[in-house]
Amino acid sequence: MSGLSRRKFIKSSAIAGAGTFLASNTMLAAPELLLKSKVNKNTSLGEIVFVPHYVQKGRGPHLYELAWATDKEWEPFLSNIKMDAKGVSISDSKNIDKFGINVRWNVEGFGWTNITADNGGEFYSLPSSGKSQSLNLNYELCKSRVVRNRHRLSDLKKSGWIPSAEVMMYVNLSEQFYEDARQKINDDFNSANFAQSGLMYALWASEKMEVEKAKFDIVLRGKRDDFFFGCDARSFYQMYQDTFLDLFSEVFNYANITFVAKGDGIMSDYQTAPGVIQPETRELLIKKLNERGIKSQERLLFWFHDCCIPDWLRDMKYDDLLKYAEKLTKDTMKHFGDMLYAMEVVNELHDWANELQLSPEQITELTRLINDVAKSVAPNVKRTINNCCPYAEYVQMNSYSKKKAVFPQRSPFKFTKDIIDAGIDFDILEQQMYYPYRDLQDSILLLEKLSTLGKPMQLSEVGVPGGPSNYSVRNSTVPFSKEPYLWHKPWNEHTQADWLEDIYTLAFSKPFIHASNWFDFVDPYYFMENGGLLQSPKGEKKEAYHRLKKIRNNWDQLPRK
């Protein structure tokens, strides 16, 4: 499904339609990204300005123009935060008394990544009207991460894990540079210089402690029989089918089957007319996978994104939509039933893929209908809710995938909580985790937050680019990036394999996560640029394929406890 605008949201910038970048060493005036609040009451107070100091050595860009605010629960909210010549400023937090800010900042030696500044866990409050406060952005980012690492390290050690000398080296270096920055707080540039180094070491400390603790937990808990290694299975129709089945079954025991209405080539043939199914293509694939002992899940039967809704669905009245959804769900589950392990009830309906502009109440009603019909027809099939955009930056953009939002928007956490509170008894909460423009600690903290909702979880779609390939260079299909690298170093086969190993390790270590599904299987049929595990339909294995096979084999050999 390459080229879809929802996915460009992730791979281009972690936002959609945000515009240009900020310059490497000067702050350019940027258009305000926010739309006026529908509430007319004036909630503005004084202003806080976070001033960036460009101590980086490279050409940049070093700061992306989208910033957004989050509350004490790390939930985004629409504010008037903006970029201008002064820096990152906010003067209206919409009556949220305590908040943090989120920016994408280039940390040379680690990556160009989104980071939260939260005043070391104490959060920020706006000054009174007419007042202004100026803060050193570099220092605030460093302080916030160093202090969080202190608390996180203490929590991780409670189960008996002892951090290695490597972890403590990064922790201690970050603490020392933070202290140096604090001592120079009245010397903005020198303080920023120390803080930048402290932040770099703190980010490495964050990731090292999480991955090391995850490996400790994996050994401690022993063999798991309740975890699926999954992948999108469209490549069955993109390469020789026997080659696909041999290579797929070598590393995966779970498959994602696309039921999208429009926009995915051969896999767009499921409906010949509204609600009229043509199941043969998927039926063959599922049967072939079942013969190999691979379980399958339906995906994208209900995905209301601009890319993938035909005009007849886009123009459908709500009452007709309910009738259509009931019939399509009933016919699909009657036909496939227990051939499937799971059925995705809705995809990305948390106010991102909402091109039909459904109200929250309508979303709840539609989700309940699909869930209940699926349960009544095929009670043995698990029902899942799949969410994207884990940090919900779109809330600050006040937009759906292609349109202005007409209702207050919700994060995946808030949306899922709302449908649980409404009594919708789905089985599995799914969260996409394409490279989230966040470090690994942020990623696992977000997943731990979602786990508090009490549902078993899967990572539904996971992936990162694989860097330039012979094919992409020869055919100019993937341009060489002129921006700072995003994670550790520029994307290549080795970096892709490193990230895959780390995210699968974190997922496998958490008993509430029961699957991790890679997207995609083969290049050049990818979403993330060269993000497949095979170089081409001929089946040449990339380093990430070998790495995944190795870690799965290692975990399969763990003793049962």
Where do the protein language model's features map onto the residues?
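Glycoside hydrolase catalytic-domain groove-lining segments
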Residues: 270-295, 361-372, 380-385, 409-484, ...
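Aromatic-lined carbohydrate-recognition surfaces of secreted/lumenal glycan-active proteins
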Residues: 230-234, 368-407, 459-461, 515-519
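C-terminal segment of N-terminal export signals and the immediately downstream linker at the start
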Residues: 24-45
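Aromatic-rich peripheral "rim/lid" segments of glycoside hydrolase catalytic domains that contact
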Residues: 335, 349-366, 373, 442-449, ...
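N-terminal export signals
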Residues: 2, 8-31
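Substrate-binding cleft and catalytic face of glycoside hydrolase catalytic domains
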Residues: 254-268, 280-359, 364-391
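Amphipathic, heptad-repeat alpha-helical segments
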Residues: 40-74, 114-175
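N-terminal substrate-binding region of glycoside hydrolase catalytic domains
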Residues: 61-90, 226-283, 288, 294-318, ...
